[in-house]
């Protein structure tokens, strides 16, 4: 388990990561607008595809409520570009190849699968206010049903 656990009221850790088009996206560039930042293990895998498509299907709901949506994974921008195109996504996916942002947000740590322990990406979602403060931190979420749960938690 990661030693980092962000809680409501915490300042979101800064990041500068390339998106699917290799354009740097920073936490500061999200300032002034509420944001949903979600961390996922790998693009184009069943669970991550489901989660991304669920965010896409609800994107109008989130944007109408003033939220931008950003996904972060260890994938390279080239893979993210293909994933965005294949799934027709209309939000940025960021590449965190060295896991710096994952670790800063506590979205990387000890996982268990079939009795085996290993280090990996912890599927996590953070809701940030206009000033970059965490208003909601959700760790170890399930891909299926996560976006529906998030909308309920946000009253959307």
Predicted regions and their residues:
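Chalcogenol-based redox active-site neighborhoods
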Residues: 1-156
């Amino acid at each position: 388990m990661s030693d980092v656990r962000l809680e409501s009221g915490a300042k979101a850790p800064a990041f500068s990561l390339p998106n699917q088009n290799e354009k740097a996206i920073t936490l500061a560039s999200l300032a002034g607008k509420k944001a949903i930042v979600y961390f996922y293990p790998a693009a184009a895998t069943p669970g991550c595809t489901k989660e991304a498509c669920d965010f896409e299907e609800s994107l109008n709901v989130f944007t109408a409520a003033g939220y931008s949506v950003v996904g972060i994974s260890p994938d390279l921008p080239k893979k993210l570009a293909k994933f965005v195109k294949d799934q027709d996504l209309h939000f940025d996916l960021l590449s965190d190849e060295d896991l710096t942002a994952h670790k800063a947000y506590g979205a990387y740590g000890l996982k268990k699968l079939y009795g085996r322990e290993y280090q990996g990406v912890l599927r996590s979602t953070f809701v940030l206010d206009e000033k970059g403060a965490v208003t909601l931190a959700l760790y170890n979420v399930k891909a299926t049903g996560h976006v529906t749960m998030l909308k309920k938690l946000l009253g959307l």
